[in-house]
Structure formats: structure tokens, C-alpha cells
């Protein structure tokens, strides 16, 4: 998937406004930055593009160095968000509060995992159906927004929730079953890979 799309407002078949709307309303492409270029400098034209979700709107004529700087800023912002989401899953000390995420796709993703959290059979295929995507599309989307696979996201979500349950006073076996692990021993092994501590050691901090 591209990180950024640059489009002229005036195009055959589909104008830039319609293209932006299609990109921003699709779960697969909603994270892609869109920059619209146009000779229309009127406030109404700019607002039409921004209302459809365009990340920037540049009127012609423009300086190439200004366009480059705007693109650089958008790509830097995307990378910052990607790093942030990646850290939420992979850093043991990162605060895990998916319900406050501003990204609709990620909120829906986390809610889907939580709904089946204690189901050992819940996996990527089921999660993909929950968010209305194919398995391949889900992996592509997660690679773009968090540089992670769907399998990794499910596993890390379960482990982060397990840590919360342990902090609430549940024992190791209870926490394991609550997040879909049928074997507390296997759960402890996977838990240690993320937190560098067994669940028992984690509760004794």
C-alpha cells in the first residue's frame, strides 16, 4: 500500500474530491495521506477537499520545495504514528488503553479481540471477518499502520490484557484462561517473552 497519494482535483472519470472520499472511507486505505493539487484557490474549493478528508490542499502555482516540505511533514507524522502503535504492542511498559485510540480501524480491531478474548480458537481469520477484511488485506493494513502482523497483534493484545488481569489480583491460571490460553505453562512461557518475567514474577514487582 502507498503511504501517500498526490492527486489533481480536476481529473477525468473521478475528480480529486471523490478519490479522497473513496480512500478515506475504506478501512484498507483510510490511513493513506492525500494531498490535493488545484488551480482553484477559493475557500470553498479548499474546504471541499478538506471535508472529504484530504490531509493537505495546495493551490497552483506552487513552489516545488513547498510541496516537498509538506510531503515530508505528512510522511514524518505517519512514521510517528506507526512507531507509536508499534510500541503499544511490543513494549512491555507501554500503556495499553486501546479504547482511547483515535484510529477507528484500530479501535474496532481491539474491540473484536476483546469480544473473543477467552476463546482459544479465535485467530486471524475470525478477526479479519470481524473487521470486514480478508486475512491478506488485514495483514497489509496492519503492516502499514503498525508494522506488525495480525498474529502478533492478537498475541500481544492477549498478553497485555493478561498483565492487567494479574494486576487486578487474578492468579496465573485465571489470567491465562481469561485471555484464551488453555495451558498456563505455555501462557507463562509466551508472557515471559514480552515482559521478561514470568507471570508469577510479574505479580511480585
Tell me what each language-model feature is:
Residues 1-6:
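Active-site beta3 strand of CheY-like receiver
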Residues 62-71, 75, 83:
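C-terminal output helix
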Residues 124-153, 177-198:
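Basic/polar phosphate-binding segments, predominantly the helix-turn-helix DNA-binding elements
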Residues 144-182, 204-205:
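Terminal helix-turn-helix DNA-binding modules in bacterial transcription factors
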